[in-house]
């Protein structure tokens, strides 16, 4: 009897529904190829949640997610909702509460450049020849984004804005284990990012990470200040395997690493809780400027679905098959507009045609 997994499908706004449709078609192909069944329940989130149910994260959506084994998330946001109070806007009103409700503390963002796409990168060919594969692991529920106190006080020109950067030993320990366990399955290197020369929270971070590293003698640990890391990512990204960051540093460096690949439309992400539950989403935004035109790149959404198979459902072979199918399609020259360079052998395709090609390769 086929194993059954429950998936909460949250397409969201902008290009979200279009790229989600292709990911679900690839999921159909996985069902046909492997002895497994995916029960999918769609729910509103972000701007769609605001328009249809009055808030970015409706209670119905939360309940659907609670009943699921994983969340497959599209993208949220757009100009239509930018005039709302910040806490009610799609991004802050949906993503931050989802992370808190489900304890999604570990964000995994691969920054991969395929050898056939090195020309799309902003870096020189000699720096990235042969491609690179970096995994940024970001602590997602602590640090300056969440710690108290924070706020704005006073009147007029006497107003003061303040935030608190705070980390506990258990918070640092659990994200460090995620990084070292990931490195064991990759290049066996962890570079921990901090600002221990000026921040007390970073002093503790470095101390705890160094202690945990002793449990993983087969993995090489290095430390790097965040300003140097930002420079080194551009100078020589191949030096990195797994990059371990606290929340704000990871937010910044993961975007930088992503852009080195040439397109955010290529990059998946996973946000994991303790256990097997996770939320999987593309690294890019809702791209409202191209929504509805059928030209969005669905690869990030499809690879995010592949990460769901690997991390929440233990289907490593299926996840690898999806990764290989994407690489095959790129080697065959299929390109959506964002990665099209008008080179010989390239074939410009739309969203659905890219999905068709990946399904055929799978």
Curated annotation (Swiss-Prot):
Its main location: cytoplasm. NAD(+) binds at residues 78-91, 285-297. Catalyzes the oxidation of 3-carboxy-2-hydroxy-4-methylpentanoate (3-isopropylmalate) to 3-carboxy-4-methyl-2-oxopentanoate. The product decarboxylates to 4-methyl-2 oxopentanoate. GO terms for cellular component: cytosol. Its cofactor is Mg(2+); Mn(2+). Gene3D superfamilies: Isopropylmalate Dehydrogenase. Belongs to the isocitrate and isopropylmalate dehydrogenases family. LeuB type 1 subfamily. Pathway: Amino-acid biosynthesis; L-leucine biosynthesis; L-leucine from 3-methyl-2-oxobutanoate: step 3/4. It is an enzyme of class 1 (oxidoreductase). It comes from the Bacteria. It catalyses: (2R,3S)-3-isopropylmalate + NAD(+) = 4-methyl-2-oxopentanoate + CO2 + NADH. Mg(2+) binds at residues 227, 251, 255. Its EC number is 1.1.1.85. GO terms for molecular function: 3-isopropylmalate dehydrogenase activity; magnesium ion binding; NAD binding. It is found in: Cytoplasm. PANTHER family: 3-ISOPROPYLMALATE DEHYDROGENASE. Transmembrane segments: none annotated. Pfam families: Iso_dh. NCBIfam families: leuB (TIGR00169). The gene is leuB. Substrate binds at residues 99, 109, 138, 227. Homodimer. One of its GO terms (biological process) is L-leucine biosynthetic process. InterPro entries: IsoCit/isopropylmalate_DH_CS (IPR019818), IsoPropMal-DH-like_dom (IPR024084), Isopropylmalate_DH (IPR004429). The record marks 145, 195 as: Important for catalysis. This is 3-isopropylmalate dehydrogenase. Keywords: Amino-acid biosynthesis, Branched-chain amino acid biosynthesis, Cytoplasm, Leucine biosynthesis, Magnesium, Manganese, Metal-binding, NAD, Oxidoreductase.
């Amino acid at each position: 009897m086929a194993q059954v997994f429950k998936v909460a499908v949250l397409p969201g706004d902008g290009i979200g529904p279009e790229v989600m449709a292709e990911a679900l078609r690839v999921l159909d192909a996985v069902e046909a190829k492997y002895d497994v069944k995916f029960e999918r329940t769609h729910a509103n989130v972000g701007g769609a949640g605001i328009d249809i149910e009055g808030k970015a994260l409706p209670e119905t959506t939360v309940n659907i997610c609670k009943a699921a084994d994983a969340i497959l998330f599209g993208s949220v946001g757009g100009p239509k909702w930018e005039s709302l109070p910040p806490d009610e806007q799609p991004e802050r009103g949906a993503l931050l509460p989802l992370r808190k409700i489900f304890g999604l503390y570990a964000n995994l963002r691969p920054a991969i450049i395929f050898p056939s796409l090195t020309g799309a990168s902003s870096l020189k060919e000699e720096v990235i020849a042969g491609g690179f594969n970096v995994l940024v692991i970001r602590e997602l529920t602590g640090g300056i984004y969440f710690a108290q106190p924070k706020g704005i006080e006073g009147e007029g020109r006497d107003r003061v804005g303040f935030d608190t950067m705070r980390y506990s030993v258990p918070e640092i320990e659990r994200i460090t284990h995620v990084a070292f366990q990931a490195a064991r399955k990759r290049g066996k290197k962890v570079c921990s990012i901090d600002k221990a020369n000026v921040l007390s929270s970073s002093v503790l971070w470095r101390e705890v990470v160094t202690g945990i590293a002793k449990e993983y003698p087969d993995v090489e640990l290095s430390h790097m200040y965040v300003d140097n890391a930002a420079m080194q990512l551009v100078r020589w990204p191949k030096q990195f395997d797994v990059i371990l960051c606290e929340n704000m540093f990871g937010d910044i460096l993961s975007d930088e690493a992503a852009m080195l690949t040439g397109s955010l439309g290529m990059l998946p992400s996973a946000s994991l809780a303790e256990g097997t539950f996770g939320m999987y989403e593309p690294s890019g935004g809702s791209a409202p400027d191209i929504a509805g035109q059928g030209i969005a790149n669905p690869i990030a959404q499809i690879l995010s679905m592949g990460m769901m198979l690997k991390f929440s459902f233990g289907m490593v072979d299926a996840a690898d098959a999806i990764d290989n199918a994407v690489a095959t399609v790129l080697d065959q020259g299929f390109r959506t507009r964002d990665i099209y360079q008008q080179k010989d052998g390239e074939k410009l395709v739309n969203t659905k045609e890219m999905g068709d090609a990946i399904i055929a390769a799978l």
